[in-house]
A protein has these predicted regions:
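Catalytic cores and adjacent flexible loops of soluble metabolic enzymes
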Residues: 1-177
Length: 177
């Protein structure tokens, strides 16, 4: 719903947000998974943003002095998104193991936010060992639960993540926020 997106961008700007985040996927580019048969594929088809929708969102963000940010689910969509804005990209938790996507994102964007809700400590090492500019990487503590109750936020993990990489943040689905 583009009208709702426009309202959300305006509210994000009013609240002082730096970014307004969306999600980018093309259903035809999604890898196979449980969503093929559990009903989510129909939702993904309805919620897929067209190229024109993306361009409109970028323009609305600029108009409202907030930066456009999107989560990317497939390397095939990376080139298109980078033509709209090369400011930043977000790698969702379930793509944290996709080192090819992370590497390509670092080549095309100034900042790469990586949600690490599904990340094991060994995976942090693999990311940090990539031949990339680590100053572009921001690890975002995230608990992959929808919605998330406050007692499960686990903010101490944020401090643990900061011990291995100083640029950290929080990306959450906190109930009521």
């Amino acid at each position: 719903d583009m009208k709702l997106a426009e309202e959300m961008i305006a509210e994000a700007s009013k609240s002082g947000a730096d970014y307004c985040k969306f999600q980018t996927w093309k259903v035809k580019n999604l890898k196979d998974g449980p969503w093929n048969t559990d009903g989510r594929l129909e939702i993904y088809n309805k919620a897929e943003l067209s190229d024109q929708n993306h361009s409109t969102l970028v323009s609305l963000c600029k108009k409202n002095n907030v930066k456009f940010l999107t989560s990317i689910f497939n390397i095939n969509d990376l080139d298109f998104v980078s033509t709209l804005s090369n400011e930043a990209i977000k790698i969702p938790s379930h793509e944290v193991y996709n080192l090819e996507l992370i590497n390509a994102s670092c080549e095309k964007f100034k900042k790469v936010f990586i949600s690490v809700g599904a990340c094991k400590w060994e995976e942090f090492k693999k990311i940090l060992d990539l031949d990339i500019d680590l100053t572009k990487i921001y690890f975002m503590h995230c608990v992959s639960s929808y919605p998330l109750n406050v007692e499960n936020v686990n903010f101490p993990k944020l401090l643990e993540i900061k011990k291995i990489h100083n640029q950290v943040g929080y990306s959450g689905h906190l109930k009521g926020v």
